[in-house]
Amino acid sequence: RSAFRLVLEYDGSRYMGWQRQGEGQTRAGVRTVAGTLERVLREAGLSVLTLGGSGRTDAGVHALGQVAHLHLGPGAPSPKELRRLLDEGLPHDVALRELAPCGPAFHARHDARSRSYLYQLSLRRSALAKPYLWWVKGALDLARLEETWRLFEGFHDVSAFADLEREDPRCEVQACELAREGSLVLLRVTASHFLRRQVRRMVGAAVWCGLGRERPARVARDLARPSEAA
């Protein structure tokens, strides 16, 4: 049994997130990043014992550095050969950034201290970067946007901003940052973990306030009293 730590970059446009969705996922039209990676490994004749990521991503979400752990059975290749197999076998929208042997106890999700998401808002229409931007039409008040964005910092019950599946709705958001680069507004959030669709809804709420269609006080109320959120 051989263990490896991987760091992957991918364009999530064609994928239903990271997590494998069961047998026959490609035939059923349900393509995931983990399922694609596992298929490439098995087609190379390798025995995949365990493959796990640092977190699930929603459909269509891209990754700059998704950490994963991989356990292979007997006959596993050297790290150099494994990298060659993946570089040659992975599709154009999935790239292996790093690969290194690791201890068998390493777990990408359990050992992660935090996770970060980056949202790119564009104040103008873009022809080339369209898949990676949200073109926000209308006058965006950046001060109001940032005021709302920073409300999410801290330990909150985020029930009003996520789809829950029996999880604990509480989440520690360590930092919400905003930066302006030309026509781009970059929203970065770092947290202990994220719930399903949480980041999208946080960004949506902040943008809605920045456009003047909602008040930051409403977001603060939904964080303080999520049971009253409409």
Q: Where are the regions that the model predicts?
A:
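Structured-RNA-binding interfaces characteristic of tRNA pseudouridine synthases
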Residues: 1-230
